[in-house]
Amino acid sequence: MKIADSGDAAALTAVEEACFSRPLNETQISSLLRGENTVFLAVWEGERIVGSVWLQTVLDEGYIGNVAVLPAFRRQGIADALLSALDDLAEERGLRFLTLEVRAGNHPARCLYEKHGYLPAGFRPGYYSAPKEDAVLMTKEFEHAE
């Protein structure tokens, strides 16, 4: 696993396209990679990115965007490793909490997030399209917060 940089935008886009019905495009990813408050983590298999996640921070809060693992590499611990790495980043940066959205019907992802200490914190009705679905907001608080 490594922190992705601007040269990884096309590979990150390919992962997004393989994982989501409404993926981020390369322009959006490039913009996020240039942001000083955003970090992309990528898991590599040889020369190929097989999993990624991005974290955007504002003051002492973190927002997790798009935990993505290529279908052929799922259920191998990659998402677990990405979430654990985000915990480390949150601790290093002194974040009070991390927040994410997940499709209400994506039970495997919701179970994964719960396993990592994320708790439901609210809903966003009709948040997702293609297909239309509610989002569940999930949050994880960190004990180092004062």
Predicted feature locations:
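Short glycine/proline-centered loop/turn elements that form peptide/ligand docking sites
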Residues: L83, N106-A109, G126-P131
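Acetyl-CoA-dependent GNAT
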Residues: I3-R74, L83-A85, L89, R93, ...
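Short hydrophobic clusters on alpha-helical segments that form packing/core surfaces
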Residues: L86-A90, L98, A109
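Conserved hydrophobic beta-strand within the GNAT/NAT acetyltransferase core sheet
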Residues: I64, L98-V102
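Terminal substrate-recognition subdomain of acyl/acetyltransferases
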Residues: K132-E146
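Conserved catalytic-core motifs of GNAT/GCN5-like acyltransferases
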Residues: E101, L119-V136
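Conserved active-site tyrosine of GNAT-family acetyltransferases
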Residues: Y113, Y118
